Amino acid sequence: MIQSGGAKYGSLLDAKASNDENNPALWGQVHNGRKGPNPWFPFRDSRILLAQLPSHVSAKDTEGRDDPAGRQVLLGAQAVIAALRGTFHLDPVPHLMRSYVPARDVGLRRTGENLSASISVLADREPNKFRRLNELVRLVADHPVRSLAVAQSNLRDVMLIIQEGNAPDEVTPARELSDGLLRFLAIAVALLTADRGLDVDAGSPLDAQVKARVLLVIEELENGLHPSMAARLLSLIRETTSETGAQVVLTTHSHALLNALSGDGAHSIVVCYRDEATQRSHLARLIELAGYAQAMAQGRIGDLVSEGRLVRHEESSADPGAVLHLLGIE
């Protein structure tokens, strides 16, 4: 949405295919907030259109003065690009985390393969977050853990190790850690460093003006994790999202994980279901499903889902009568 003064205009950019069969370009109409018809520009069809806008629109007019309309267009485009660029799909692959990695490779990658380097820089630069990571590991590990540490090779490559007991030689290197613990560590590090410790593309000087944030996506959070680990991560998500400003989207089929959500947590659950009539998938908020209030009075979310309840949108998206009945005011 473009705004110029008190007036608001439609979408930022409308595109259509070229009528020239010999020209594969797209034509885009830029809604710039100025008086008169909106200009049309040619765009390459092999690149995102919004990223090409700076070639056609400027924040300065022909005399070098600030152009508020042009700046609005560029800021709108940058807001969308920053949101796309900031989407970080974390898919930890434990067997890739068991080798030495260059110490300078610190931005956590989507596979978690450079976890050791990320933890190394966390220990050096953010001791408070490193301390929290240690506390989490002690809570979920099935053996006594003194501290996380990093071993360094002669080539200055690093590998994560866990120090156990009091003897200096009681250590377990990353190559011997369980898949579940490595996956847990990768997710925890991503959450703790979501504001500046992930391997996302470099931003633009305009990002600060559009308040760009990271969107961390984790599919099947419970995979390879003991239910207690998953519950700890849920608590960490609640804490870190307010600290880092990041948004987190999780997918899950775990009843135990759903049971760990309580209070306001239910308001953030979205159910994905397939409409049998149309064979299309739909999304609906859990609290908007018919019968939600009555169902929640009879059990926990995960238990209800395992019984086949609260898994699809039936008829009505509101159930005020059930709420009044539960409150005893009919």
Please annotate each region the language model reported.
Residues 88, 156-160, 268:
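Short beta-strand micro-motifs in enzyme catalytic cores
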